[in-house]
């Protein structure tokens, strides 16, 4: 958490150095929090410090190093491959998500504010795999669900846009949704990177080769990443609350 605060401070410095662009993009993204172009611009302008950490975490991991070396891209061809996968696979779920939301990988906004080519790729990779993360954790594209995804990205990457997205989206949330933020922060913490012995291993999402799992069972992805989908977490919380109150989990 302290590291994330450091990356947020670095993001503030980055914003100050590109103040006009930052203010313009932030204003537009608050007005329209699902506007991909402006959210992307804010993310890049505030990302430099966090991107350095993301690169280091990838360099210290075998899969991460391979991703940096080969620089795979998520394209419409990736989606075509996923759409041919049978039900039960991660690829099928991903293709269904993309079809329902009328998304195409090639429609992703290209990185425009990061000069270093390696860091630019790291940012591009993060952007292109965003929909994989949506699919993995079971979130759609409402403002509230985007916040959930951004919080997990923030815990894994330190990118300030995660917290900025929460702050900027508050005017669009109901009181109940705002109260739910405590649960979402807890869920993101449960799913934070973890390599402690004897505990569930959760790799940095930057070190997950998502494309490898497209033709694999969805459950294999969850097992290998250690990530608990948001609906599973909420059901677990509901069950624990019921037990604490002396109730049956099924409410009977």
Swiss-Prot record:
Pathway: Cofactor biosynthesis; ubiquinone biosynthesis. It catalyses: a 4-hydroxy-3-methoxy-5-(all-trans-polyprenyl)benzoate + H(+) = a 2-methoxy-6-(all-trans-polyprenyl)phenol + CO2. Its EC number is 4.1.1.130. Keywords: Lyase, Membrane, Metal-binding, Mitochondrion, Mitochondrion inner membrane, Ubiquinone biosynthesis, Zinc. Its cofactor is Zn(2+). This protein may be expected to contain an N-terminal transit peptide but none has been predicted. Lyase that catalyzes the C1-decarboxylation of 4-hydroxy-3-methoxy-5-(all-trans-polyprenyl)benzoic acid into 2-methoxy-6-(all-trans-polyprenyl)phenol during ubiquinone biosynthesis. This is Ubiquinone biosynthesis protein COQ4 homolog 1, mitochondrial. It comes from Trypanosoma cruzi (strain CL Brener).
């Amino acid at each position: 958490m302290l590291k994330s605060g450091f990356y947020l401070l670095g993001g503030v410095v980055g914003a100050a150095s590109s103040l006009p662009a930052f203010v313009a993009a932030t204003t537009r993204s608050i007005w329209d929090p699902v506007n991909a172009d402006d959210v992307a611009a804010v993310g890049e302008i505030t990302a430099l410090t966090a991107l350095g950490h993301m690169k280091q975490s990838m360099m210290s991991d075998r899969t991460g190093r391979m991703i940096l070396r080969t620089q795979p891209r998520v394209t419409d061809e990736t989606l075509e491959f996923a759409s041919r996968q049978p039900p039960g696979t991660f690829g099928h779920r991903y293709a269904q998500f993309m079809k329902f939301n009328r998304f195409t990988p090639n429609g992703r906004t290209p990185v425009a504010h990061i000069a270093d080519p390696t860091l630019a790729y790291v940012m591009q990779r993060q952007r292109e795999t965003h929909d994989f993360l949506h699919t993995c954790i079971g979130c759609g594209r409402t403002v509230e669900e985007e916040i959930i995804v951004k919080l997990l990205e923030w815990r894994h990457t330190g990118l300030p846009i995660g917290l900025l997205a929460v702050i900027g989206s508050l005017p669009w949330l109901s009181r109940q949704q705002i109260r739910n933020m405590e649960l979402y922060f807890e869920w993101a913490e449960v799913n934070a990177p973890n390599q402690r012995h004897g505990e569930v291993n959760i790799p940095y999402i930057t070190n997950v080769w998502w494309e490898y799992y497209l033709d694999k069972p969805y459950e294999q992805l969850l097992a290998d990443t250690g990530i608990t989908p948001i609906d599973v977490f909420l059901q677990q919380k509901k069950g624990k609350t019921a037990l604490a109150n002396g109730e049956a989990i099924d409410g009977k």
